[in-house]
Amino acid sequence: VYFGRLKGLSKIDTKKRSEDFLKQVGLTDKANLRLDKLSGGEQQKIQLGITIINNPDILILDEPTKGFDPVNRRLLMNIIEEHQKAGATVIFVTHQMEEVERLCDRAILLKDGTAYAYGTIAEIKEKFGGASLDDIFIKVYGDENNAEEKL
């Protein structure tokens, strides 16, 4: 509730949005616990809730689904996608190419601070001969069998 108030929401609106979010991510039974009593994944869900409580125009997220199982990854991506469809611009860092395919209009592939590709998903795939984003990722970053391979 504190963060909603901090972001200018009324106490009633903050309480409702907080309750709705906790229900959406399956944490209603943890509503009265201190953050340090939650697991890492639960804390990460709460951090997303704090980020989106006031429906910002821009969401900047750093690996929002890192460490989650497929069920919770999909849940969080659904929440992020809802905000995107409501008009929010979403900028995020991820190593999950299916998340890029699902949410991104444009993408930048970076390695060591250098942009290797930028454009729509179709443009990036075309640049790399129609390969899947996973294959492009492996080509750009290498794989465990050939870590020295460079573009």
Q: Which residues make up each language-model segment?
A:
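Conserved ABC ATPase "signature" region
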Residues: 1, 5, 10-30
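Catalytic Walker B motif of ABC-type/P-loop ATPase nucleotide-binding domains
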Residues: 59-62
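Helical segment within the ABC ATPase nucleotide-binding domain
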Residues: 74-86
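ABC ATPase "signature
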Residues: 118-119
